[in-house]
Amino acid sequence: MSERKQILNCIDDPQQALIMLKRISARTSLEVQENAISSVQNILTEVKQLGDEALFRLTEKFDGFIPKPLEITPEQTLEAWEKTPTPLQEALQLAKNRIEAFHKYQIPKDFLKEGIHGELLGKNWSPVEKAGIYIPGGRAAYPSTVLMNAVPALVAGVNEIIMVSPAGPNGQLNRTVLAAAYIAGIKKIFRIGGAQAIGALSYGTQTIPRVDVISGPGNLYVTLAKKLVYGQVGIDSLAGPSEVLIIADHSADVEQVATDLLAQAEHDPLAASILLTTESNLAKKINLEIENQLKDHPRSAICRKSLKDWGLIVICKDIKSCAALSNSFAPEHLELLIEKPFEFISQIKNAGAIFLGEWSPEATGDYLAGPNHTLPTSGTARFSSALSVETFMKSTSIINFNQAALNKTSAAIMELANSEGLHSHSRSIEIRRSKPSSDD
């Protein structure tokens, strides 16, 4: 096989595989972030101090136009929907309906339980008042991201959703993105992007309201801005470049595996496409099939860059070894193209989303399966989850002790308070337990 056709590096050493997977996971290095973080901080400070004036200046600097007016009118949003072809309207509506139906299962329930001494203990859930959603834009269009961010907020009961998205070269937002916003019921839309948009949502400007939670993916500057404003507002996650890991055995279809790897690679030169397989012959065929598909691929250059830099095939001794490597990488998307995928789920501990079998390519989840496509990246699936209804909600603990419950537990509470040297904590219990019982 020629070097040209070995577009994906193929290895069979498990230790080398671990090293390479770690390198891929860390592809947005701390050094790169440190180089950008001072610029992001300056942008945020300017927006905080100058508001709309900063947004106009920064957008002219980075995007080449002054976004006056900032806000998209309801008439423009309606017009975008009406000019959307009927098949695409129907696809957007179907996606919205399925995402909404799935996320309704996630609505957390309030509860109030009686403790052993008659005390009442519980938890109440409530939505945030305002949510900001960031939709990547410019030369690209992601209507699915509008639905995946807005619908969970709607299901949560958020009162007001504010959408920001960078305009294209003509200063306009993509029509399909606006159409998605229309069916999601978003009333406030602003044609602003980058770190300055995150600053506007965090601090508020003369035109853009301050929000309580910000969700949505973006480039490095957007991600760093979200990181810096966290604490001022809530955020969904710090999204990195997208990734797929496919586990395939003898039953996998070569064309399907190759296409699914390319479906990830076409996103971005930093996207990672990884195949773990027990079949060395499959690995060879995959490289050939990828080369064949790239001959007329419209994003061939991006795919080649992505696969060359961040693609990998690992030949594993058995399926259990595949699971171990996958868990160490904690992929954003995990496809199980194996004979009995359901029997394998128990071995998977770390993954943003799992796609089981040949009829469940990642694209089903990207668009309209129902579960959210905003998933943890860069190994963060070890400890974090997909965007959900709870992203836009917060819980409040409910505590109602009666006199008997306080008296029964007072000695232990005072002991703990005194151990921490907190006199008034202890006294707040003592003065109550010495009070005559209401039964006396």
Curated annotation (Swiss-Prot):
CDD domains: Histidinol_dh. Binds 1 zinc ion per subunit. It catalyses: L-histidinol + 2 NAD(+) + H2O = L-histidine + 2 NADH + 3 H(+). Its cofactor is Zn(2+). The keyword Oxidoreductase applies. Substrate binds at residues 242, 264, 267, 333, 366, 420, 425. Transmembrane segments: none annotated. The active site is at 332 (proton acceptor), 333 (proton acceptor). Zn(2+) binds at residues 264, 267, 366, 425. Pathway: Amino-acid biosynthesis; L-histidine biosynthesis; L-histidine from 5-phospho-alpha-D-ribose 1-diphosphate: step 9/9. One of its GO terms (molecular function) is zinc ion binding. NAD(+) binds at residues 134, 196, 219. It comes from the Bacteria. Keywords: Amino-acid biosynthesis, Histidine biosynthesis, Metal-binding, NAD, Oxidoreductase, Zinc. One of its GO terms (biological process) is L-histidine biosynthetic process. The keyword RNA-binding does not apply. Belongs to the histidinol dehydrogenase family. Catalyzes the sequential NAD-dependent oxidations of L-histidinol to L-histidinaldehyde and then to L-histidine. This is Histidinol dehydrogenase. It comes from Prochlorococcus marinus (strain SARG / CCMP1375 / SS120). The lineage of its organism: Bacteria, Bacillati, Cyanobacteriota, Cyanophyceae, Synechococcales.
